[in-house]
């Protein structure tokens, strides 16, 4: 570690610098459901880009069956996410996961979550998640070292709890919706609102100077 000006040059083992957590549900070969947490997810238009391990059950399922649901938990639901964290749907457990992960076929039950049918895809939704995005993987690309997959998923339908929707609109209320953030392997919610983008179509609530 060395210092340059006012910054230190460091080599962190991970770069999870604060991104939303999602729960990805996919369909197994036998028609049952797999559910996996991940924090490498971002949206561009109606496409959500996902990064996931190449040897996991989610990757295996999406290669064969492209349907999925991107379920977004709230900050308060982090214990359910953590219950899923040490589980894998792969049997046998992949070599790189042995010792830290265990095989669990009933992921919904293990997390204390309830499945509910989707409308346009075969994968199931997580009933407790306020936002549920039915989607289909349209492109799957390996990374440079074949350790991960980059999945481009086209969102087909969005389900939202009325509590996080601006009444009478198609907008998610940013003052009501509090995503779960994965910050260097710690779980966080959002702090108070600081401001808004010039492109926002929802009103500012309780921000000083506005």
Regions found by a protein language model. Give the residues of each.
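Basic, polyanion-binding surface patches
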Residues: 1-210
């Amino acid at each position: 570690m060395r210092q340059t000006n006012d910054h230190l040059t460091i080599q962190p083992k991970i770069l999870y610098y604060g991104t939303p957590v999602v729960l990805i549900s996919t369909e197994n070969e036998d028609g049952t459901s797999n559910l996996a947490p991940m924090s490498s997810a971002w949206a561009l238009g109606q496409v959500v880009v996902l990064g996931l391990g190449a040897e996991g059950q989610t990757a295996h399922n999406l290669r064969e069956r492209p349907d999925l649901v991107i379920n977004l938990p709230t900050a308060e639901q982090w214990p359910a996410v953590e219950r899923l964290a040490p589980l894998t749907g792969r049997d046998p457990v992949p070599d790189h996961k042995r010792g830290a992960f265990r095989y669990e076929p009933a992921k919904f039950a293990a997390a204390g979550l309830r499945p509910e049918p989707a409308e346009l895809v075969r994968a199931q939704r997580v009933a407790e998640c306020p936002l549920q995005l039915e989607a289909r993987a349209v492109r799957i690309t390996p990374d440079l070292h074949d350790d991960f997959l980059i999945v481009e998923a086209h969102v087909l339908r969005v389900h939202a709890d009325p509590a996080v929707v601006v009444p009478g609109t198609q907008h998610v209320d940013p003052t009501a919706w509090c995503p779960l953030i994965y910050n260097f392997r710690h779980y966080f919610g959002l702090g108070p609102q600081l401001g808004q983008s010039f492109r926002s179509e929802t009103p500012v609530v309780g921000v000083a100077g506005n």
